[in-house]
Amino acid sequence: MTYKEYRDKVLNFIEEHEKWRSHTINLIASENITSPSVNRAVASGFMHKYAEGWPKQRYYQGCKYVDEVELIGVELFTKLFKSDYADLRPISGTNANQAVFFGLGQPGDKVIVLHTSHGGHISHMPFGAAGMRGLEVHTWPFDFESFNIDVDKAEKMIRELEPKIVMFGGSLFPFPHPVKELAPVAKEVGAFVVYDAAHVLGLIAGGEFQDPLREGADIMTASTHKTFPGPQGGVILYKKFADDETIAKLQWAIFPGVVSNHHLHHMAGKVITAAEMLEYGEAYAKQIVKNAKALAEALAEEGFKVIGEDQGYTKSHQVIVDVSDLHPAGGGWAAPLLEEAGIILNKNLLPWDPLEKVNEPSGLRIGVQEMTRVGMMEDEMREIAHFIKRVLIDKEDPKKVRKDVYYFRLEYQKVYYSFDYGLPMKE
């Protein structure tokens, strides 16, 4: 094969992927779809540019237009999240967490985070960014019944350990975390309160879920491509939470600590997404939560064991389903079958699963944010629940269901809650 043929093959795979993706029901909770305007930014000449440092204080020349875009971004993000500072330079949510761990922690300092099985992100773990910084990682006590941090036991843990950082947020995140209840206790022992908003940033922007910076968090870290429907990237939002020297340590941890050039085409895409969310974020976040509740209720009616029934199943974009009663391999069996039917989601550990079950966990994690953005509403969620039932409970041939999924998805090809297409119209 010639090198040009390799090129052609790659371009063909990209084209095939885009065609395939546009005809699937994508329920991956950590993905979304960007608007045409954001796509223009990401594909722009900003991808060729390098910039280090702050706007107007660069180490490279030729940043005149890049600086203006980034300054607009700081203005829009601080307005959207009512923060004192917004730093768009992290290139991922994990990268944002790295900056916090390196800026505010020293090797041997204690941090309290959510355990992976309970929904914590890998970057919070001893084998992730927290451990790589040399932090001593402790995990929140968890209440299986409420599917959340156990507040009483957590208060006791904070007072006993006197950690440097307490961290809320995670990857399995159907219900708000008790920031309001635990932040005052953390402040008593001098801990920084950090909230990883990667999954719920768009819901926070739209006034749904919870408002961490008003509830006591000092800092929010996040990725920008889940419920916040931008390009892949990260952001750090924070209040004037400490003296100037401490804040400077965080800023220096970002650059030159863990970021050099900050992928300016993605930065520009984040800025446009912030403008979209200021215009449409409230409607978008509201519909996401409505859709998640509708899907959860429909799945329960179809015979699935949906987690969190006593609390209304979910208050976020996520629906968590325990499928271990359908097959010994649980989510490891269900997710590939659903992919054959054109329904894309991921297997997931549930709080009672040991880490050894990572490939055959009990659960499925479902997110509705992308299908909401292409215009789907509660009625469509009920149809999706029935597609899932046909595959997993009725044991129908996934290829047969795939045909129905294909035609169902054909109607939903526009990216709403954007300046390109506005709001979806309910017929």
From Swiss-Prot:
Q: EC number(s) in its UniProt entry?
A: 2.1.2.-
Pathway listed: Amino-acid biosynthesis; glycine biosynthesis; glycine from L-serine: step 1/1
> Where does the record place it?
Cytoplasm
**One CC-aspect GO term:** cytoplasm
Please list the GO biological process terms of this entry.
Answer: glycine biosynthetic process from serine; tetrahydrofolate interconversion
Cofactor(s) the record lists:
pyridoxal 5'-phosphate
Binding residues for (6S)-5,6,7,8-tetrahydrofolate = G120, H121, I122
MF terms from GO for this chain are: glycine hydroxymethyltransferase activity; pyridoxal phosphate binding
Q: Identify the keywords attached in UniProt to this record, alphabetized.
A: Amino-acid biosynthesis, Cytoplasm, One-carbon metabolism, Pyridoxal phosphate, Transferase
Residues annotated with N6-(pyridoxal phosphate)lysine modification? K226
Matching entries from InterPro entries are given as: PyrdxlP-dep_Trfase, PyrdxlP-dep_Trfase_major, PyrdxlP-dep_Trfase_small, Ser_HO-MeTrfase, Ser_HO-MeTrfase-like, Ser_HO-MeTrfase_PLP_BS, SHMT-like_dom
Q: Where is this site: Plays an important role in substrate specificity?
A: H225
**What does this gene product do?**
Catalyzes the reversible interconversion of serine and glycine with a modified folate serving as the one-carbon carrier. Also exhibits a pteridine-independent aldolase activity toward beta-hydroxyamino acids, producing glycine and aldehydes, via a retro-aldol mechanism.
The family database entries (NCBIfam families) matched by this protein are listed as: PRK00011.1
Q: Which HAMAP family match?
A: SHMT
Summarize subunit and interaction data from the UniProt record for this chain. Homodimer.
- What family, per the record? Belongs to the SHMT family.
Protein name according to UniProt: Serine hydroxymethyltransferase
Taxonomic lineage: Archaea, Methanobacteriati, Methanobacteriota, Thermococci, Thermococcales
